[in-house]
From Swiss-Prot:
Its EC number is 1.11.1.28. Disulfide bonds join 131-134. The gene is ahpD. Pfam families: CMD. It is an enzyme of class 1 (oxidoreductase). Transmembrane segments: none annotated. It comes from the Bacteria. Signal peptide: none annotated. This is Alkyl hydroperoxide reductase AhpD.
Length: 173
């Protein structure tokens, strides 16, 4: 099942989500690696296997093995980092922010693809997971690399739409 077929199976009350998935698939503003990498990272970031499977089918042959692995790695490391750094950010005791994280995250330094694309995937998953500290960190790096605000906004939209599609599909009555 493709991502389009997945979206087409959403109930009528989620018509807007279905249309938004179609808009993302038809997006011409992002590079292919960014578009399909974002979709894959966000699908994995949702933690919902049916949308992961549909997105894996959608991106097959459209992403290099390195880019697909980087998208999956972004989702994996953000699953860890977003929880930890959201804790650091929200805890009243600021001492935690001064302590070393002691978490392995080597993939951030060596993702196997362009740094800005990996940061974009990480930002989208961080938006899905609600980690403000991570969003700010990734957005800052992206802007330093010259990534335009509309590209960053698109990444956040991908996260929002994929999260909504996964949630609706998982809870449809």
């Amino acid at each position: 099942m493709s991502l389009k077929e997945f979206a087409d199976a959403l109930p009528d009350y989620a018509k807007d989500i279905r249309l938004n998935v179609g808009s993302l698939l038809g997006d011409q503003t992002l590079t292919e690696q960014r578009k399909y990498g974002l979709l894959l990272a966000c699908a994995h970031g949702s933690g919902y296997k049916p949308i992961v499977e549909a997105t894996e089918a959608e991106v097959a042959g459209k992403l290099s093995p390195e880019a697909a692995n980087a998208a999956r790695a972004a989702a994996a490391v953000m699953a860890m980092n977003n929880v930890y750094y959201r804790f650091v950010h929200l805890a009243s005791n600021k001492e935690y922010g001064q302590m070393p994280a002691k978490l392995r995250m080597n993939v951030i330094g060596s993702p196997g693809i362009e740094k800005d694309d990996f940061e974009l995937f990480s930002l989208a998953v961080s938006a899905m997971n609600g980690c403000g500290l991570c969003i700010d960190s990734h957005e800052k790096v992206l802007r330093q690399h010259g990534v335009a605000a509309d590209v960053i906004q698109t990444a956040a939209r991908v996260g929002a739409v994929i999260k909504a599609a996964a949630t609706v599909h998982a809870t449809a009555v």
